[in-house]
Amino acid sequence: MALKKVTLADKYDLTQDRIFVTGYQALVRMCLVQKERDRRAGLNTAGYITGYRGSPLGGLDYQFQRAESALKPNDIFFQPGLNEDLAATALWGSQQAELRGEGKFDGVFGIWYGKGPGVDRSGDVFRHANFAGTSKHGGVLALMGEDHTAES
């Protein structure tokens, strides 16, 4: 019996049914899967991932940067924030991009990541974004890695 050919690129190849990934890589793949689900539903969406590189989830940015060749052709963009507050504000803006029907995309799905103190800092943005909601074909996943002593 011949062994199956496996490459490092398999983790982001949606035609592969069995892959081995880390948790961070699973989040990257999740964005590719969301884009494909939207495409099959007749939607032209984009992805926007942002957060604070100093968070306990700091390895997440590294995975998104490494996967740029798979993400960019699928209109999925990673842009680190200067801090959690600015990243959250930018992501909130992505949910308003097609508010009046003038956007380039039908919607933008997004991920925000930060640490506990950054969640505190970003309370205003979270509150207002929660009241405003997401775009019809968008959505946001907020991830927080705890850092009780704010040392990361």
Q: Which stretches of residues belong to each language-model region?
A:
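Thiamine diphosphate
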Residues: 1-152
